[in-house]
C-alpha cells in the first residue's frame, strides 16, 4: 500500500525514488482505495485496478515506457504488459508474484492464518498505538532500523482505512495471473529477496522460469522492502539501472513533434509502421481494413508533419517504438 505524500520523505522509500527518478521521468500513483486516491471505492476488483493503470498511462501521454511492478503491483503490471505489448518497453518485477497467497497455498492452516491477519487489520490498523501494525512491519522489513519500522507503521495507517485495507488484502490474496506469463513480449527483470517472508522466494523463481527470456537476480536479504543500508541494495540498484539503460526506451526526439498528439489507435498503427510492416500487414495484425489503415497513416503523417514513410520510421524508432521485433 502507498501514500504519495508520506512516501516522499520516508526512509523506506527515499532511496527507491532517487534510484527510479535518476535521469528519467518517474510516474507514480496511489491505486484505488490507497493514499491520496478516493477511499472506500465501491467498485474494487482486479479488472478495475488494471483499468486504473491504463487510465494513468493514457493520461501521462507517454507512448512507450518501462513499468516497475513491486509487491501487489506486480500482477497489475503483468496484466497491463500482456494486454498492451506496444506500450511497454520493459518490465521490472520486484518482490512480487503471479499467484496470490490463497491461490498458492489453499490449505486450512493458511486460511486460518489469513483470517487472523484480517482480524488484526480490523482491530489495530486505525489505532493510535502501532502495536498491531508492527506485526505487518516486522514481517516486511525484519532487519530494518527502528526509524524505518516506525515509518512503515505510519504509512500503513495513512494509506487506507481498516475496512479498505481488509478488502484490498483479500483481493490480492486471490489474484492469479500465471496464465499471462507466457504472453509477455517485452524484456523482463525479476528481483526477489531470498528470505522474503511476505512473498516467498519461490514466487520470484516461478516468474523467472515461466517468463521467456526473463533475467533473474536473487537478493541476499530478509527484507521485502530493501533498505538503503543493506548489502543487497547496491546489487538491486545496479541491476535495475543496467536493465533500464538497455531496455528503458529512448526519450522522444526534441523536434517539436509529440506522440501525445496521436490517438491510442494511431499509436498502435505507428508502432507497427516502426516495426517495418506495410499497410496490408498492419491491417491483418490489427484486424482492420486497409482503407482504415491508410486513413490512420494519413492522420499520423499530418499530425507529426511527415511526408516520407522512411523518415517516419526512423523518427518513431528514435522515440522508442518498434523495439519489440528488433531487440
Which residue ranges define each predicted feature?
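Conserved HGGG/HGGXW glycine-rich cap/lid loop of the alpha/beta-hydrolase fold
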Residues: 1-38
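Conserved acidic catalytic loop of the alpha/beta-hydrolase fold
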Residues: 47-65
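Flexible "cap/lid" loop of the alpha/beta hydrolase fold
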Residues: 78, 82, 89-123
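Conserved alpha/beta-hydrolase catalytic His-Asp/Glu region
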Residues: 126-171, 180
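Short beta-strand/loop motif that positions the catalytic acidic residue
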Residues: 184, 190-192, 196
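Acidic catalytic loop of the alpha/beta-hydrolase fold
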Residues: 195-199, 225
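Catalytic active-site module of serine/aspartate enzymes centered on a nucleophile-bearing elbow/loop
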Residues: 214-256
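Helix-turn-helix DNA-binding segment
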Residues: 252-298, 302-303, 314, 318-327
